[in-house]
Amino acid sequence: NLFNSLARIGSCENAGDADCRPTIIANTPQELRTQLQSIIRQIIAEKLAFTAPSITATIQEGGSLYQAQFEYIQFGEWQGSIFRSELRPDKEVIQGLDHEGNWSSAVSLREQILESSSGGTNDDGRNIWTVLPNISYLGNWNNFTTDDANQDAINSLMGRLNFSLLDYHNSSSECSTSNRGTNHPSPLGADVGQDGTADEVAGLINFIRGQDYFDYDGDCVINELRSHIQGDIYHSQLIEIGAPDASTQFTDNNQEGYFRMVNGYTNFKLQNKSRTNIIYAGSNSGVLHAINASTGREEWAFVPPFIAAKLPIAINPLFDGRGPNGEGGSNAMFGVDGSPVVHDVLMRGLDSQGELEDDPTWHTILFIPYGRGGSGFSVLDVTNPIVEPSRGPLHLFSVYNDYIRKIVYIADEEGNITERAYVTNSVNVE
């Protein structure tokens, strides 16, 4: 038709050329914005290149050196990992995964999933959680799943910031039955050409959990484990949190050391002296990883609610079958891209059951800015960093500033979201 002809003239010389672009069809302003963003991200992906893995963050703790690295992927999520290397007293660094005690978080994560699923169960061994209204994460810290109620709540969350879900797999896409004989050898996975975006919601959830929803390997099996799962850790600096160690020394009563001393911080240190050391790092897959500093295994992963709302950005139908052998792809995005900050705070916080305490107690609070992932942040209580049936990390609140629509979104401890419109140059918080 006329529009397809105009699209062809504006993008390529001859019909059928690899750089030809289809007509943009959008039914709403939000869908048009998402479509245009997908095209812009495709153009950037085609022009961008890195020649080698990049080291983006380094911390030194005791006898360990931790380094975050990522590798650029042109039409997909960039691949990241944290490497632990032994650091000897003479400052010699012993690298290599064959050295005892060294690990790669990306390798450990994939092994963790394979070990958990080897018994034929659907358990992938991960605790991935967020905050959803009326769906508590307490007890298992694993509500970022495709269970009906969870998926419906996550779907509602994805529409909160006006990002539209695009239909990646449909009746005419690369992995549909209509393309089987032409573009792919047999045998192949089940037909995944479902029209509509219900499968995209489940697909994004499963992609976060490690499945190959976008068919990176081109075999049209979209429920298999990807060869690499952890997203890139780019601007987010690593932080290690173990036993509380803030100072109680002071020279006058206006110092924080004095405040700690007179308010029972020493008892808090004693009660948590054996607390497991955890590496916290934000990745652009959209999660905050909590990684055991000794083993490299992921203890849990938190998807901030306002980052979950932006996950539709990853979908780009223009990457469907974009690879030389029909491989699919997705947009690289900024997720949890800020650097976590920790502090021990005396306050009326939440108890292990998520209820407000009667009196102030000490808590280890983790502040998680989104960085380039968006103008927002989440605040967690990581006093108890290991998931157990009766205790674990707690969400306190999250905030997102939509400076385009002039709205501040606030998610409370249970995931209930309120909207506050700008008032002149301030925000109404009453």
Language model segments and positions:
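A fold-level detector for beta-propeller and closely related beta-sheet-rich head/sensor domains
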Residues: 1-430
